[in-house]
């Protein structure tokens, strides 16, 4: 008789971050579906999905249903830090594991969470490392008015200060706010070297559209001179911004669809076969896919979905994934991840301009790399592509 292992999926496919949620949803479902074809007959992998519709209170009730009513011992889910923090106490209460795939602001390490998304030394630091020597040390910070925006900009402010940089301005907007005229006017007045964009969803789209228009009116603000740089912008949002609108701006991620590896070509073919030839996988889709495969493989190889056993297994056995060799540190439950900086092309893809080999996560920036990685002139073994 086969052992039934239920894995919960908890993503919003509606609301201000719907495009991210859809990519995560699809990545989880495809990852489990592909894993089931290779699972041992003794393991019956079952997926139980819930959509909180971007309602914070529903995250809690849906997570409760997955854990208590359906008997899931693993949940792949949540996008925002607010949602993650909302359900962690419930996950702890049920002795379960939450698998979190999104970039976040760091300063967290919980034994009930496996973090396969990047923390600041895997996204913000590599981005500043690339941008500051090329464009300058004067930054304008704009962010979503919640913990992701606050904390990421706080870290950026600290890192800029340590590198003799300057914050020329700092603004925060709700995720669904699209009136960015005052922010654009302030940027035009202060003329920063680059803009660090930590907005989410419609506010980010509106800002990039308005900045594109500013660049058309005033050549000083063309992205080739003063780019907008992001730590959470991927392929899944470029269509909503508008064709070619974000061209020349930069983002950092552990995966871009343009990666030229044989593994990525095979992955893209599989995605095209399942989701259509026009679907360009983002880091959200790829990371959720890799995470779902990791969960399924760990359950299959150990023969149990016991979270204690699975956590011990995944923190002691590296896995080959579409992101590369994924190793999870037993001290922090965070994955080592590559960092790629991509420049948005006219075709709404990312041209990779810098790649960093897998970086060990340092969620509390406790090691020298956390404060020294962005200082020009240090040997950091970066591979500059262009």
List where the protein language model places each region:
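Solvent-exposed, acidic/polar segments of extracytosolic/periplasmic ligand-binding ectodomains
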Residues: 5, 322-386
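Extracytoplasmic "Venus flytrap"
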Residues: 8-27, 50-52, 280-284
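Beta-alpha junction/loop-to-helix N-cap segments that form part of ligand/metal-binding clefts
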Residues: 23-24, 38-106
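Short beta-strand elements in bilobed, periplasmic/extracellular small-molecule ligand-binding domains
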Residues: 38-54, 110-112, 161-177
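Periplasmic-binding protein-like
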Residues: 67-79, 99-101, 140-141, 191-207, ...
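An alpha-beta-alpha
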Residues: 116-171
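Extracellular/periplasmic periplasmic-binding protein-like sensory domains
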Residues: 211-289
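Short, charged, surface-exposed loops that flank catalytic or proteolytic processing sites
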Residues: 300-312
């Amino acid at each position: 008789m086969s052992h039934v292992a239920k894995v919960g999926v908890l993503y919003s496919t509606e609301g201000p971050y719907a495009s991210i949620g859809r990519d995560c949803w699809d990545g989880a479902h495809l990852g489990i579906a592909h894993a089931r074809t290779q699972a041992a007959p003794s393991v019956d992998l079952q997926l139980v999905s819930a959509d909180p519709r971007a309602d914070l209170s529903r995250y809690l009730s849906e997570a409760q249903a997955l854990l208590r009513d359906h008997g899931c011992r693993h949940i792949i889910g949540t996008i925002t830090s607010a949602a993650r923090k909302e359900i962690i106490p419930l996950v702890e209460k049920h002795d379960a594991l939450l698998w979190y795939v999104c970039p976040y602001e760091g300063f967290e390490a919980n034994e009930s969470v496996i973090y396969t998304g990047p923390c600041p030394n895997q996204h913000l630091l590599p981005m500043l490392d690339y941008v500051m020597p090329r464009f300058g040390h004067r930054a304008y910070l704009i962010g979503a008015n919640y913990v992701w925006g606050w904390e990421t900009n706080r870290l950026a402010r600290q890192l800029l200060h340590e590198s003799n940089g300057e914050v020329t301005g700092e603004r925060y907007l709700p995720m669904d706010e699209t009136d960015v005229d005052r922010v654009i006017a302030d940027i035009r007045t202060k003329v920063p070297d680059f803009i660090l964009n930590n907005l989410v969803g419609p506010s980010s789209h509106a800002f990039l559209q308005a900045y594109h228009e500013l660049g058309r009116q005033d050549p000083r603000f063309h992205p080739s001179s003063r780019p907008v740089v992001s730590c959470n912008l991927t392929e899944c949002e470029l269509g909503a911004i508008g064709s070619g609108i974000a061209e020349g701006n930069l983002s950092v991620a552990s995966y871009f669809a343009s990666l030229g590896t044989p593994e990525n070509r095979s992955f893209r073919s599989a995605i095209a076969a399942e989701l259509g030839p026009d679907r360009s996988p983002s880091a959200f889709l790829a990371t959720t896919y890799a995470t779902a495969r990791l969960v399924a493989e760990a359950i299959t190889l150990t023969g149990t979905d016991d979270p204690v056993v699975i956590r011990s297994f995944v923190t002691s056995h590296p896995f080959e994934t579409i992101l590369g060799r994924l190793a999870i540190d037993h001290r922090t439950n965070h994955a080592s991840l590559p960092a790629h900086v991509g420049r948005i092309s006219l075709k709404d893809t990312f041209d990779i301009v810098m790649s960093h080999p897998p970086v060990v996560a340092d969620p509390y920036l406790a090691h020298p790399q956390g404060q020294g990685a962005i200082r020009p002139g240090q040997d950091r073994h970066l591979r500059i592509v262009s």
